[in-house]
Amino acid sequence: YELHRQIPLLLHRFAKQNLRHKYKEENLFFLGQIGRRIHSAGRTMAVVAILLTISLATMFVGLTMGAGYKANMKAYYPYDAGVAIDAPLEKSSMDSIVSFTEEHCGVEDSVSYYLYAVPEKSIEALSLSDYNHLREILGLSPVVMGNNEFLVHCDTWNYMDGIRQGLKQQPEITLDGRTLTIAVTPILTEPMEQYQMAGTKGYVLVLPDEAASQLVGEKIRLAMKLEDGGYPELKSDLKQFLNSGKWQPELQSGQQLPEKVTMGVTVRAWGVANSLTGFTAISFCGLYLSIIFIILSCS
C-alpha cells in the first residue's frame, strides 16, 4: 500500500523540480491540480493501483499455468497408445492387442519390446533396435552406436547429475564377459515416458542388440502410433480387453509369472481430454479473479 501511495507523490515531486518544465505554459496549473488530487484522493488511487496489480497478476498466473499444464502433456503422453505389462511374456502375446486396436482405429506403426534386467545393476535396458523404433514412432532421428558401446536415456532431470557422476566413475560395464564403453553421446534426454514405457525409474540403459539378447526380458511393452491419434475411450476399451478372456498371453520359455503382475494402459487422447479440464479450470479461475479485481478497481 505504501509503495502505491508514495509513487504518485514522488513522480509529482520530480516533475516540480524541473523548473523550466514547471513554468512552461499551462504546466503550473496542471501540476497544482495533480498535486491537490494526489493529496485528496491518494488512498483511493493506491487501493485502485493495488487492485489492478492483483488483477494483472492473477490473469498472468492463470494463462501461464494453464498453458504450461497443457504443454506438459507431450512429455506425459509421448505415444498415441501404450501397454505396459510387468511380466516376461512372449512378444507374440501383444499381436492380439494390436489387432484389437486396429478394429477400433487405424494403427500406423507399433513395436513390442522388452525391458531387460541388467545383472547386479539397478537399471533396466533396451535393445538399440527397439530404442530406435520408439524414436521413429516419436518422430526422432535414429541413434547410431558401436557394437561395444552403450548409452543412457534419461528424461527426468533430477537424475541427470547422478547419472553423469556414475558414468565418470564407471565409464565401462561388463555383461556376460563382454565389456562395453560409453558412446560419444552418453546421455539422451528426449521425452519417452520413462516411468512406465521406456523404463520404470526415470532412466534406461540402451545396449547393442547382441548384448541385450543375452539378458532376460522381465517386462514387456507395446507402443503404438495411431491414425488421428486415437480416441479417449480407447483406454477403457483396451483395459477391458486385457482383463477379458479374449486375450491369451504366453510366457517366455523357462520363465514364471511374478507374484504381482502390474499392467498399465496409456492413451494420449484420453490424457489430453482430461488435461483440457484442468487447463480450462486453471485459466478460468485466473481470468475470473482478474475480472473481479478490475471491477472492484473501477467501482
Name each region found by the language model.
Residues 58-79:
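Hydrophobic alpha-helical transmembrane segments in integral membrane proteins
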Residues 36, 54, 63, 84-87, ...:
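Membrane-embedded translocation segments of transport machinery
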Residues 11, 15, 19, 66-73:
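Membrane-interfacial segments
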Residues 72-277:
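Nucleotide-cofactor and metal-assisted catalytic machinery
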Residues 1, 40-65, 272-299:
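Hydrophobic alpha-helical transmembrane segments of multi-pass inner-membrane transport and secretion
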Residues 14-33:
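Juxtamembrane inter-helical linkers in multi-pass membrane proteins
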Residues 22, 35-38, 272:
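Helix-boundary and loop/linker segments of multi-pass membrane transporters
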Residues 1-15:
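Hydrophobic alpha-helical segments
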